């Protein structure tokens, strides 16, 4: 069985700075990391290897220059996948969910798969669209919000979803796309042995042309800025007489 687990490289929020001049966010010094939600998908895929005979897990990502980072590749492979496929092209730097899903679907078809796992959303945008779009593009079942995988056979995956007032159990025919929630597991921290072994695992680097992808730019430039900080006036009203109460009420009306 071939299991693909998709992931996205996102900026490390600890490295994002705010420009004091205009309040815009500066990502120039932010290192890339695996989206937190995709760590759950990677962990789930590797746990499924224990349920499926001769299962192989392939990590897959599409993106820009962040995917060229050797440290980032090793981080992914140290978490259990048997191999890594990255599709690198400048046009993926600002791809919208539709373009990302189209590229992932094309890459998955080229690689071959029985099951595709991904996180419910990404740590940076959390659009919660890509997984379902991949299923739609491939014309296969797609389920999101999965909080537990019960069993896996050669042709069926049984999962649970936590709804508002009940737990839903679904049997999904394969091939399929499943987007998992953070409730599904707690991603393990790779051991030193796993980190060293990651360097020996195969990595395939594809271009957009390799998967037959050539989309026109479909994004719009928007400003991302920190909220404006309002300077406190530090008005202190001393006393509890009628004049002080009236002054307090007047100042309160100014900010409501």
UniProtKB/Swiss-Prot annotation:
Pfam families, per the entry: ETF
Keywords: Electron transport, Transport
Listed GO biological process terms: carnitine metabolic process
TM region positions: none
Domain of life of the native organism: Bacteria
Entry's Gene Ontology molecular function annotations: electron transfer activity
UniProt keyword DNA-binding present: no
Annotated function: Required for anaerobic carnitine reduction. May bring reductant to CaiA.
Subunit-structure text: Heterodimer of FixA and FixB.
Database matches in NCBIfam families: PRK03359.1 (NF002888)
Name by which UniProt lists this protein: Protein FixA
Source organism (scientific name): Escherichia coli O17:K52:H18 (strain UMN026 / ExPEC)
Phylogenetic classification of the source organism: Bacteria, Pseudomonadati, Pseudomonadota, Gammaproteobacteria, Enterobacterales
Gene transcribed to yield this protein: fixA
């Amino acid at each position: 069985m071939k299991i693909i687990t998709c992931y996205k490289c996102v900026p490390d929020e600890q490295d994002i700075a705010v420009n004091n001049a205009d309040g815009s966010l500066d990502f120039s010094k932010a290192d890339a990391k695996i989206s937190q939600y995709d760590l759950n998908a990677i962990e789930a895929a590797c746990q499924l290897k224990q349920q499926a005979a001769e299962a192989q897990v392939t990590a897959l990502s599409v993106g820009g220059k962040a995917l060229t980072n050797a440290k980032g590749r090793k981080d992914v492979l140290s978490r259990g996948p048997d191999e890594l496929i990255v599709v690198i092209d400048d046009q993926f730097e600002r791809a919208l969910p539709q373009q990302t899903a189209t590229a992932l679907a094309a890459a998955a078809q080229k690689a071959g798969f029985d099951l595709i796992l991904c996180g419910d959303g990404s740590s940076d945008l959390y659009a919660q669209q890509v997984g379902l779009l991949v299923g739609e593009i491939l014309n296969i079942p797609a389920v999101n919000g999965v909080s537990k995988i019960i069993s896996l056979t050669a042709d069926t995956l049984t999962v649970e979803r936590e709804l508002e007032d009940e737990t839903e159990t679904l049997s999904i025919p394969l091939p399929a796309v499943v987007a998992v929630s953070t409730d599904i597991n707690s991603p393990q921290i790779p051991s030193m042995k796993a980190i060293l072994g990651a360097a020996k695992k195969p990595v395939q680097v594809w271009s957009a042309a390799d998967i037959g992808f050539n989309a026109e730019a479909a994004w719009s430039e928007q400003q991302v800025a920190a909220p404006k900080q309002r300077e406190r006036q530090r008005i202190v009203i001393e006393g509890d007489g009628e004049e002080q109460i009236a002054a307090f009420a007047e100042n309160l009306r100014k900010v409501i």
